[in-house]
Amino acid sequence: CMSARTRPEPPFPSAKPARAETEILDVFDPDPGRQYDMRDLLGCVVDGDSFDEYRADFGRSLVCGYARIEGRPCGIVANQRMMTKRKMPGGKAGPSEAVNMPAVIYDDAADKTARFIMDCNQKRIPIVFVHDTTGFMVGRDSEQGGIIRAGAKLVNAMSNCVVPKISLLINASYGAGNYAMCGRAFDPFLTLAWPNARCAVMG
């Protein structure tokens, strides 16, 4: 790490987060059964209104976006800890909506995040990963939807990403979800964990 004397100045002026930092304790709940909106938590961390979400209406089980922290640009990949909905292609009855479980990575979100990681890598923007996941969705419907292909695409994008990566474990980080979110195996530049964080290859 660079000392404060040799560290380059941020390219943008720093700004206070849109929400007070103390509100993190009101937003986040360590109880695995409780839900919260990851965007509210990010609002307590990033500079002002700098968070620019990437494809907000697609792959909602993962929140991706560009932001600034203390004036320094970064990409953010965070698990969504609340139920979300996704549009499903319909048959005779037409399109329908399905409910996504909290903290689970679905195929559409994995696809979106892989593309976002590749974009950050091309733009030389460091990435912050905020872990709160129980892993990838399993089951017949998920496999028919392409979770294996999408999950492999996400892990491949991660393994080829050369920009600095920071991992923040705020709750659970289990199974293949830990790998997809830049777990220890990908040697992140820095790993931080809240006191209640739990991390394991098998959940």
Positions of PLM-derived features:
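Ligand-binding clefts of soluble mixed alpha/beta catalytic domains
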Residues: 1-203
